[in-house]
Amino acid sequence: MTITEEHARLATPAAPSTASAHRPLGIPAVRLTGGFLAAWQERNADATIPHCIEQLEASGVLDNFRRLVGESQAEHRGFVFADSDLYKVVEAVAWEIARSGTRTFDGWLDDVVDLVARAQDDSGYVHTWIQGVRPDQRFTELEWTHEMYVGGHLIQAAVALARSAGRVDLLRVARRFADLLVDRFGPGGADAICGHPEIETALVELYRLTAERSYLHLAAKMIDLRGRGLLRAGNLGDHYFQDHRPVREATSATGHAVRQLYLNAGATDVYLENGDASLLAAMDAQWADVHERKMYLSGAFGSRHRDEAFGDDYELPSDRAYAETCATVADLQWTWRMLLAGGAAGPARYAETMEREVYNALAAAVDASGTRFFYANPLQLRPDRRTEENAPRERASWYGCACCPPNIARTVAQLGAYVASATDDALWLHQLADAEIDLPDELGAGTVRVRTGYPSDGRVEIEVTGEVVAGAHLCVRIPRWSPGSALVGPDGAHRAGDDGYAHVPLVAGSRYALEVSLAPRLTRAHHRVDAVRGCVAVERGPLVYCVEQADLPAPLEVDDLVLLAAPVTAGDGDTLRLRCATAPAEPGLYGPEPAPRPQSDHEVTAIPFSRWGNRGASAMRVWLPTAAP
């Protein structure tokens, strides 16, 4: 197939082909030009992506392909899904090409795409663990072999390369694999689903690129087959695989958090293409369940280590939080699709959730160098915490199960896609980011320029230049935690409407200004979140704060702090100053009521949660006990 200018214009991760409530803008059309997000994207391009490429070599992922074509004698290394690490890095490179136009990675892309193409067999099948270790077990143990999951990441990488660079070499590989799935599991074929969802959302995106409806039909079939007991549950139970109940009847999220959230992204994609209202209703119910009862303050998900799973409603322990980085990535994808779909929560709620996730859970998952990563993201780390394989005390340069680092790389490269969207008569600014946004054709040939130091500075200035169609509007989200703010322009001040956005005329030459309050605020949890009852967290703008042992003078310890009823004040840079007492030492594990009163009074520094752990292993906590009146 030929990749047209239209495809290039839609260089974005999710591009609905039907009339969605909101339409995405291509990554080249939304340029992050300053501030935190732009700097992060530059670090991602200069450090994270090259580091991932190095680790693909060091971890044996590329050798796994080479051994299939006779270019390596090494044994297969890594998990059954290790191929997906390569595909996610390819996708990261693709979105970086869309963002910056870089040619830095062209030679590497040529080599790895050629390698994958040569490893693919005549049937279209490609999966290095099965081909090289268990060639007689193709599609026989779908609970654990991740064949479709890995293929889903292959498809997403191929679509991204086609949209961003016009390359169809990997797309040919991906389509051959997708055609194999259609032949084997499509209409008239076997009923089967993958133990780890991902293929569903990928097939829909492949349909959007190619207009081949069999891909959409297979994705829809796989959504419909959930809950029919097709997967052997084993000791983790069918909830783990989201195979306990049909998707349309599953109103609460359960089981492996990443699997659930990828499945929901796929279900929402299917709705966006076929308009099945019953799917959207189920997704509305699940979205409310996840974000009102199962999301950490940082925008992380997953309370249990054993099966990387959601816990019960309000089961959100800070110190034992699993909070896998990939779960936040998966929810970003799902929540964006819910925004495009016009879900019941409304665009402001979706955009606010994504903002929380990006500035906190996702940002904390990578260090200041861009080369060390958290897999699990607890909101409290005790001083004697033991390192576990996927939950180390410090960020690691890579993991045996390395799903998270490439996921971070591909997500950061595509952040511009989530800043704004369009409707028939309006441009919607969802994120207050320093950016240049080209209007889509239906709104004119102009540019909306946003200048801001947010989230360090609450002032946002917006200028409209170029040609704009008559009657167009600009809709700017005003954060819920800044209810007194208004968008001020030539025709006066405009406050947020019921939808959370200020609506103003989109007119060439217009200038608007918004002052967002960045006053520190104290946040409490729902009373059923027993793990943090009697505690508060400190937030400023979209940032969650924490206290880290590295900022405390001896003999203070972070787990002894009690927050006093005193104003939280600004410190140096993005830090805050808290007034804390210390809980007195007690001789036993239990004691009589009332507890001894906290002692002394100390000024304590709080830092953004996203920055913790950059000074070595250190105790930390987000939720602080409060002193009794």
Short names for language-model regions:
Residues 470-480:
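Surface-exposed beta-strand/loop patches in extracellular or lumenal glycoproteins
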Residues 37-39, 88-103, 152-167, 200-211, ...:
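Well-ordered alpha-helical scaffold segments within catalytic/enzyme domains
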Residues 482-505, 522-528:
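Solvent-exposed beta-strand/loop surfaces of large extracellular or lumenal domains
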Residues 2-8, 219, 283, 352-360, ...:
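C-terminal beta-rich recognition modules with glycine/proline-rich loops and embedded aromatic residues
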